[in-house]
């Protein structure tokens, strides 16, 4: 018997088994449809760097999701990633500064294009980190906050709320953040 557990020996095989069997997909636990569904939308991590200690909150969500599955409830933990506009711009501008350039040197269109490419390059590693941690989200349903279908739903919802008078303009103090 080995003196210490070496996760790299076992966990890739276990993870592959989970993925091959779609173990975390909605309906994978043969749920009792008479029980109330459990749906949890993952607060999307920002696609501008690695996960950090703050992302440990996902452990709590994972526990709740696994518990709902064990109860036989129809269960979905919806994963996603976010572009985090302002923060991503800050991170990307620091990267540019380290390379001796700035967004002003690039021009607006080139800067926008390069930030978009940067975000695209960061989404994969973040999702991979979450999978390595064993989070039981339905990875086939991964969403990005700027996916066309997500943007369409947000715009439709905004227009509906505006038309119903739930969104309005006025001179009011707002809690922004």
Regions from the PLM with identified roles:
Residues 1-177:
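N-terminal, positively charged nucleic-acid-binding surface of large information/translation enzymes
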């Amino acid at each position: 018997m080995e003196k210490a557990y070496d996760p790299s020996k076992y966990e890739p095989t276990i993870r592959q088994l989970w993925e091959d069997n779609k173990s975390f997909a909605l309906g994978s636990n043969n749920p009792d449809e008479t029980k109330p569904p459990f749906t949890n939308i993952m607060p999307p991590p920002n696609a501008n760097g690695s996960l950090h200690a703050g992302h440990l909150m996902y452990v709590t969500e994972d526990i709740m999701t696994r518990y709902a599955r064990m109860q036989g409830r129809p269960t979905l933990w919806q994963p996603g990633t976010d572009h985090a506009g302002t923060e991503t711009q800050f991170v990307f501008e620091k990267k540019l500064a380290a390379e001796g350039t700035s967004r002003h040197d690039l021009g607006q269109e080139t800067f926008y294009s390069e930030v978009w490419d940067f975000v695209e390059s960061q989404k994969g590693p973040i999702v991979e980190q979450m999978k390595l941690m064993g989070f039981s989200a339905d990875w086939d349903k991964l969403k990005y906050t700027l996916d066309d279908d997500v943007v369409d739903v947000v715009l439709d919802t905004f227009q509906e709320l505006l038309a119903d008078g739930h969104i309005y303009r006025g001179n009011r103090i707002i809690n922004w953040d």
